[in-house]
Amino acid sequence: MFFLKAAFCRVFQTGFKLALPVLPYREPTVISSCAELKKVFEAEKLRSVLVVTDKGIVNNGLISPLETVLNENGVNFALYDNTQPNPTVQNVEEALALYNKNRCDGLIAIGGGSAMDCAKALGARVAYPKKSVGQMKGVLRILRRIPTLIAVPTTAGTGSEVTLAAIITDPEKRHKYALMSFPLIPHYAVLDAALTYTLPPHLTATTGMDALTHAVEAYIGRSTTKETRRLALEAVKLIFENVETAYADGKNHKSRENMLVAAYKAGVAFSKSYVGYIHAVAHSLGGRYGTPHGLANAVIMPYVLEAYGQSAYKKLYELSVAAGVCDEKDGHKDGAEKFIAAIKALNAKMGIPEKLSGIKKEDIAVMASNAEKEANPLYPVPRLMTEKELEKFYYRVSDWSK
């Protein structure tokens, strides 16, 4: 039975890879600061926008530059600042009500991936007012253009400012919906390093490792292209060169800027080449317990990479060379092991734990099933795994396991 399922998965993935050149992928127009949004407002004829964010961004004053440019250009705006770390269906519906009440014609998401994912799902609800978030989950379910979406990342990690994905949690079902459609790619991305200066060290670490996960999974998968391989390698190099500095010195402009570039490149890479089991397991943990996505990815990543074994040695070796943690003369296996060891070392240096708390044994089978359904057949992983194999990761990362 597994052989037949595996064959179907590989045929499905090959089909997507062959179709990639003709799929309507686009990248957002990149802007270097909020002050430059004036030309966007004029080009898009925006008169009233909904700003989607969270209370932390508001309390830190990070929306001030945005408010200034909106007021200076006579653009009315309403503020939705109740987005949760793992945005929920309720967040999307609350934001939709505010969008409609204020007769908005555009969206600005400022914050981390949560705000951007919430805004993307909101855009989908505007485009499809009769469909629920759950009805739009999956691949290519959204075909209509969403309202103009401007993404302003204040973290360097999620890559949501360039991706076609939005992850929304349904607390009642304790499950995450993955919406993956080309119209969800933001139309504009503001990459301003100054907006990331106040990001706390722990979030700098976990979002940075999130970006690393994107680059790694995009590179080691079986649906890569010359472009996505190049972008992933460049992202890995930038992250290994800059994330520790950004963690230790939040106002180091160059490291913050390089991390934004790395997150963007990793975002483009995984949008076209997809992710893998690291993300699938992390999403199941987030849906079940609200585990922060970047933290889950960082903790899970070494275990999954080790489990891929020989199927990923060559590509992990190439990433190891790019990261500067092994020599080209090292063998594939040695290089791969050095890369995984370097990831563990990065986690330790930045205070990321080896284990996660709160995982219940009785939940593991359901989470593994959800992860398997998310990953197969879509994610072109180096080696296909069964639900039983995926269950092992939850045991490995649980703080009650040895």
Locations of regions flagged by a protein language model:
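Carboxylate- and glycine-rich phosphate/diphosphate-binding segment that chelates Mg2+/Mn2+
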Residues: A165-S273, K388
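C-terminal charged capping/lid subdomain of soluble metabolic enzymes
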Residues: F2-C9, L316, C326-K402
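Short glycine-rich or small-residue beta-strand-to-loop segments that form or flank ligand, phosphate
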Residues: S48-D54, A78-D81, L107-I110, I150, ...
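N-terminal small/polar loop signature for handling phosphorylated ligands or for N-terminal nucleophile
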Residues: V58-K130, T245-R256
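C-terminal catalytic subdomain
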Residues: S273-K338, K344
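Glycine/threonine-rich beta-strand-loop-alpha-helix active-site module
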Residues: Q90-A193
